Amino acid sequence: MKILFVAAEGAPFAKTGGLGDVIGALPKSLVKNNNEVSVILPYYDVVDAKFGDQIEDLFYFFTNVGWRREYVGIKHIFRDGVDFYFIDNKHYFYRGQIYGEFDDGERFAYFQLAALEAMEKIQFIPDILHVHDYHTAMIPYLLKEKYHWINAYHGIKTVFTIHNIEFQGQFNPSMLGELFGVGDERYRDGTLRWNDCLNWMKAAVLYADRVTTVSPSYAKEIMTPEFGKGLDQIMRMESGKLSGVVNGIDTDLFDPETDPHLAVHFSKDDLSGKAKNKAALQERVGLPVREDVPLVGIVSRLTDQKGFQLVVDQLNTMMQLDLQIVLLGTGYADFENAFAWFGHAYPDKMSANITFDLELAQQIYAASDIFLMPSAFEPCGLSQMMAMRYGTLPLVHEVGGLRDTVIPYNEFEKTGTGFGFQDFSGYWLTKTLEAALDVYYNRKEDWKILQKNAMTTDFSWDTASQSYEHLYKELA
């Protein structure tokens, strides 16, 4: 099967979040099953700086962006069995950052037009064209409404994946003629219109052959007003083609037996090294070195979406419990200041590291006893899976991907991989933390069972890619 991914970012070339992880890992995994896989990405300045000497120039052509002719350079690298093609245009992509420009609409309109026209020129006409988030959401529409005259494109099936429904790509409808070079009939009849704007994500949901999200629970949640961000009605209408597939993680990268960032390696059969990592981390971040006290780890952006209004609200109460907290992350100034204050007030209990450090993040995943993730909403979430690989038990708000990946502890059946609370409130966060501490202190054998359960759960991309491949085969 021939599969083409088109996305705004992809590891290791350019990455800001979970989308980049997916584009870096899923194609590589699909290749293992004898699929022919290619990826089209923008050629950002950050890509040029890191990989410019490895990437080859193939050719160039020009595309129409409204009334203008724009240069489209095609670059290529073959990596991990996947052909990566890059759309090169310095005006649009040499900005010092991937997103957040005043003309993002124009930048990604150009990218989508260039990617669609490049397929024929690179001689890769896919069976499945898989696009991601709003930056490429107009592609299913353009394929069927603008490029339908190209015979070679007639058999292409499209899949659209929503990584975060909050960012929908809402623009002035004049963009249809001025940038995409199409008429406004589909806007006037309501197909592309939402809240009196051109909505790219709505277009993708209506025109794609299948729509996926990054977890089954999130697929259900976005059909509700609480999580749908205004598009819940459209999601309910198109629910027949909507499904969820949990992302995987790179299990080679997050492996306690080989991780180069750890002080001591360990495994599910011998957890003695975990205690040594805990001591090394406590020493590094300035906490008292105590094996008997549970260490609660946090690695996150400090935002409302990640639930830190609950944590900050409950910090005073948490500091009265017999525990230590190590935090790594940046975000809202109010949250940063609150954690920093508690770090100064309770130096024996709280270490607040208001920065981001990849090595320290790995050490927190590996050395903590509990990993705190109380997100208000979480399409998938990767940190909880990373923590579980190291026998660190997640404590989560049971929402989205957190609900799908963390099984709450059952004291009667001795099952579970972590702890969870359903009501999004500080009270239940603290109550659940107290329950976890009770298991840590008073039910040591149960704790070991939970650790082993967590470490043996399969979060590899091979499992996730099988689900996508099944979906592709249904279409093709």
From Swiss-Prot:
Gene source species: Streptococcus mutans serotype c (strain ATCC 700610 / UA159)
Entry GO MF terms: alpha-1,4-glucan glucosyltransferase (ADP-glucose donor) activity; alpha-1,4-glucan glucosyltransferase (UDP-glucose donor) activity
Record's keyword annotation contains Transferase: yes
Keywords on record: Glycogen biosynthesis, Glycosyltransferase, Transferase
One BP annotation, GO: glycogen biosynthetic process
Signal peptide extent: none
Keyword presence, Nucleotide-binding: no
Protein name according to UniProt: Glycogen synthase
Pathways involved: Glycan biosynthesis; glycogen biosynthesis
Binding residue positions for ADP-alpha-D-glucose: K15
Family: Belongs to the glycosyltransferase 1 family. Bacterial/plant glycogen synthase subfamily.
Catalytic reaction(s) noted: [(1->4)-alpha-D-glucosyl](n) + ADP-alpha-D-glucose = [(1->4)-alpha-D-glucosyl](n+1) + ADP + H(+)
NCBIfam families: glgA, PRK00654.1-1
Domain of life: Bacteria
Enzyme Commission (EC) number: 2.4.1.21
Protein purpose: Synthesizes alpha-1,4-glucan chains using ADP-glucose.
Entries under Pfam families matching the protein: Glyco_transf_5, Glycos_transf_1
